[in-house]
């Protein structure tokens, strides 16, 4: 596997990879001596809008050996929002994947326990999508 990364002062440019190569790419970047990105800092989700029909996921990686940061990007189709889970490579991905599922509705296939974390049980919709319409069913707080 070859990554044409452009090295900056202490990071690499974001590189776009295909969804079906995500787990393989993460394994390679984590275990290859040249890169050794052994830490996943976070996963960021971006709604690119209805016109594009896509979401972008950005995986922020860090190498404790070299001190370099790297970013891997994948595009997810809005009408079929599925992407492979990277929990088997980075255990720290679990909560980010659940939060992104909760807020954007992106399904991380093979996540061992994908569930909503922030929204109350029974909540409909995904609040950080640009097409989300808030209804007026506000939570009733007990006094």
Residue ranges of model-derived segments:
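Terminal low-complexity/charged segments
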Residues: 1-143
